[in-house]
């Protein structure tokens, strides 16, 4: 190409968290299949159905939280299967794509929860309001066990 304003780069550069984190106030937005009460993210598999690889999610999550003034958002609908399944889960049904220690902000149509730097108990308190109201009570009962352990 001949346009000097365009630079073609490999994903080894464009997905490099160290490169991206140099951008000030970078906000990254990724999706998920489900998020557990402590902020662990599954973006790969639903039950036995493998839906795809990580697609650079971990790189962009880490870049967002390392960027000066930046954030990393994981956005997902609160339910699946026409409202029959909560995507805010007690336990993930698939692998952990993004670890809880990398979770920054989780967003559903019911709000946003800032998780970075929070205890496991506080994370559960912040995650439950993100679930559809039909699922909050069973999630709260499960979260009570996490809180009871004192984490």
Task: Give residue spans per PLM region.
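Conserved phosphate- and dinucleotide-binding cores of soluble alpha/beta proteins
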Residues: 1-151
